[in-house]
A protein has these predicted regions:
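Short, well-ordered beta-strand elements
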Residues: 223, 504, 514-523, 531
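An N-terminal boundary/leader segment
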Residues: 1-59, 65-69, 91, 309-322, ...
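A short helix-breaking turn/cap at a secondary-structure junction
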Residues: 72, 200-308, 541-577, 585, ...
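Gly/Ser-rich, acidic/histidine-flanked active-site/gating loops
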Residues: 7, 87, 93, 248-378, ...
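Sec-exported extracytoplasmic/periplasmic mature domains
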Residues: 19-20, 33-45, 61-68, 117-118, ...
Length: 667
């Protein structure tokens, strides 16, 4: 039997360990939770997973029982994952990072969560984000996530990287994959800064039902994985037709016909051939992203170490049989009118002049209100009942954002909702606007691809990475808000026009040790071809680097042991308690564990193993920690995190049970 190393383990690695008896799902959940306790809640305090699923061990134990009985639900049964705080998971809060919704409880699972639950995957917890995903690295009700690569730099783009917790958690091996989202670049930016794979699908490619909306025309589900094969395994589960449309804008609106998910996907994503996919492909790299743009009003300043990585990537692509050509990029130039002669969608009459205002106000207000009404939490039944001042408050000392004309107070949504929410069909300019977005994509991107004989475009995902103190330091903010750094390259264009992208690791910058991604973008609804060419590059280059700040813990390696010869069927009962007593500069944690059967016991406090004294089926012990352990700051709206105590017990007949508790602070 081979040993299983948790850090960087793939879905296939974990599944193999589950199948051959090296590990159980309960033990996987315990190990990931210990990493969260050690690196996320305490220690370097990455703060990526602020909400834990209290039922994680029960879900894992149910998976282990199915496996013993030969009734597994599929390839992801027992596999732990995280989801962004904007995904509904029944019974958990769905705050979307906002103090206004800190106690909003999800009445059902989002589509993707439901698909994963039905496949047996185990939700560890919900990941951090700024309020309502309306930004990137602004601090929300749970604070923000930090970088596992370099504490001095941001884990996502400051202005658009709201899936920052998902990026950090997946990179740091707090789970094997994460579910993020994107409206501008909130999935791509954290993927780039964390050496991850991210997929932003064509419109309707993955149902977004049950996800908090931001701007419905742009919002998409974005899976985060460490490899393309992991992404493909995940897509096999979450890409499916959704019979319900409410809450998934592009399938609700009646004016633009989009394909069903089943029409876009292959029989098996995991079986897609990747090797050789780049051979013979002609790829365009926009000059604006590789330091060769001339004539732009606001040129992109790309860091020298990013350009070094790009030059290597270009050589790699050519070695894999692709032709790489430098091109102008009218789809971005026209959209942003960034140079003389560029003409926007409105300039050309493709989109009504009032569409932008109707989209950001009427449409978003309608979608937020509809989300709350569908969720049916009596405490917050609709948008008009929300405390608007709490939606996106500024923490003390934070610099003002620099969105310019796009900046406004989200509290105004509530005030407008109190005057009445217009039904979707009654919002002026929406039909013409949606059709105009589709026409713009065809004219400025797909027709342009055809005219230049291009199969796709490829580009560095970002021009630079912002400093970690960009929220409080003016000089750092100047860099973090610079074009190419404030939002991942492409800015709003990909999502607004419905252009699919796949981002994979391009390498790690030699000067600052931060990763950078390589983004591939292609024709709408040609997602499978895009996945294969990105997968071919990732397969051949393996440019992902392991975060140096989150190494393996002592118990992150599971030794091959084979399946137990006899496995009991009865539930393995255990009761875990912990109490904290303050004594000057230290806190004493008293732990008690009772098991219903004789068992081997492993207990950890904040990821560190502790010894307990046993008497029959009762085990007790005490741990001393610095009082500062329970005084850490992560949010002005919450108290300090407590210590996480985990217990894994294994009975002589092979049954494994787990439990956790939190003491000395919030959970």
């Amino acid at each position: 039997m081979l040993n299983l190393h948790l850090v960087e383990a793939s879905i296939a690695n974990l599944r193999r360990g589950l199948e051959d008896g090296t590990v159980t799902s309960v033990e996987l959940v315990g190990a990931y939770l210990n990493r969260i306790a050690h690196f996320d809640r305490h220690g370097i305090a990455l703060n990526a997973v602020p909400i834990l699923n209290p039922n994680m061990f029960e879900e894992a134990e149910a998976s282990d029982r199915r496996r013993r009985e030969g009734k597994t639900l599929g390839s992801l049964d027992g596999i732990p994952y995280t989801a962004k705080d904007s995904y509904k998971a029944k019974g958990l809060t769905v705050a979307a990072g906002s103090p206004a919704f800190q106690h909003l409880t999800a009445n059902e699972d989002a589509f993707t969560i439901a698909r994963l639950r039905a496949a047996g995957a185990v939700l560890i917890g919900l990941t951090n984000m700024p309020p309502m995903a309306n930004g990137g690295m602004q601090r929300g009700v749970y604070g923000r996530a930090e970088s596992p690569y370099n504490k001095d730099f941001l884990t996502a783009a400051f202005a658009s990287g709201s899936s920052n917790g998902s990026g950090t958690a997946t990179a740091a091996s707090f789970a094997v994959f994460g579910l993020g989202e994107e409206t501008w670049s909130s999935g791509r930016a954290p993927a780039s800064n964390n050496a991850l794979v991210a997929y932003t699908p064509s419109r309707g490619g993955i149902s977004a039902r049950g996800n908090w909306p931001l701007v419905p025309t742009m919002d998409v589900v974005v899976p985060h994985t460490r490899t393309v094969p992991d992404l493909l395994e995940l897509l096999d589960v979450i890409v499916a037709d959704d019979a319900e449309t409410r809450g998934d804008f592009w399938r609700v609106q009646p004016w633009v016909q989009i394909p069903k998910a089943s029409a876009l996907r292959p029989a098996s994503y995991a079986a897609l051939p990747l090797q050789g996919a780049l051979k013979g492909k002609r790829l365009g790299v926009p000059k604006m992203y590789v330091g060769k743009d001339e004539g732009a009003d606001r040129p992109i300043e790309t860091r020298a170490s990013v350009l070094d990585l790009w030059r290597q990537a270009a050589r790699d692509l050519e070695a894999l049989g692709a032709e790489v050509v430098e091109v102008d990029f009218p789809v971005v130039s026209n959209y942003e009118r960034d140079r003389p002669g560029a003409r926007t969608m409105v300039d050309r009459g493709l989109v009504p002049a009032e569409f932008a205002e109707r989209e950001i106000w009427d449409l978003s207000i309608w979608s937020w209100d509809d989300f709350l009404r569908a969720n049916a939490d009596p405490a917050i039944p609709d948008l008009a009942s929300v405390d608007g001042a709490k939606i996106f408050p500024q923490p003390p000392g934070a610099l003002r954002d620099r969105y310019g004309d796009a900046d406004f107070d989200l509290a105004q949504y509530v005030e407008r909702a109190k005057q009445g929410v217009a039904p979707l069909a009654d919002i002026p300019a929406i039909e013409a606007g949606l059709k105009g977005l589709e026409a713009t994509r065809r004219i400025d991107f797909e027709d342009w691809l055809d005219a230049n004989r291009l199969d796709a475009v490829v580009l560095p995902a970002v021009a630079d990475v912002g400093p970690a103190d960009a929220d409080v330091d003016e000089a750092s903010a100047m860099l973090a808000w610079r074009n190419g750094t404030w939002v991942a390259n492409g800015n709003l264009v990909w999502r607004h026009l419905g252009i699919p992208t796949v981002t994979v690791p391009m390498g790690t910058m030699a000067d600052i040790g931060m990763p950078v991604g390589l983004t591939f973008a292609g024709r709408a609804y040609d997602d499978v071809a895009l996945l294969t060419i990105a997968g071919d590059y990732e397969r051949a280059t393996r440019r992902r680097t392991v975060p140096p700040r989150t190494p393996a813990l002592a118990d992150d390696v599971f030794e091959g042991r084979g399946a137990a010869s006899r496995v009991g069927d009865a539930h393995l009962t255990l009761a875990l308690t912990a109490e904290t007593t303050r004594s000057g500069a230290t806190d004493e944690i008293a732990i008690a564990l009772e098991t219903g059967d004789a068992a081997v016991v492993k207990v950890h406090v904040n990821g560190e193993p502790v010894s307990l004294q046993g008497s029959g089926n009762r085990f007790t012990g005490r741990v001393i920690v610095p009082a500062t352990t329970h005084q850490g700051f992560h949010s002005v709206w919450r108290g300090s995190y407590g210590s996480i105590v985990t217990a894994i017990v294994r009975s002589p007949d092979g049954r494994v049970g787990g439990a956790y508790t939190v003491t000395g602070g919030i959970g």
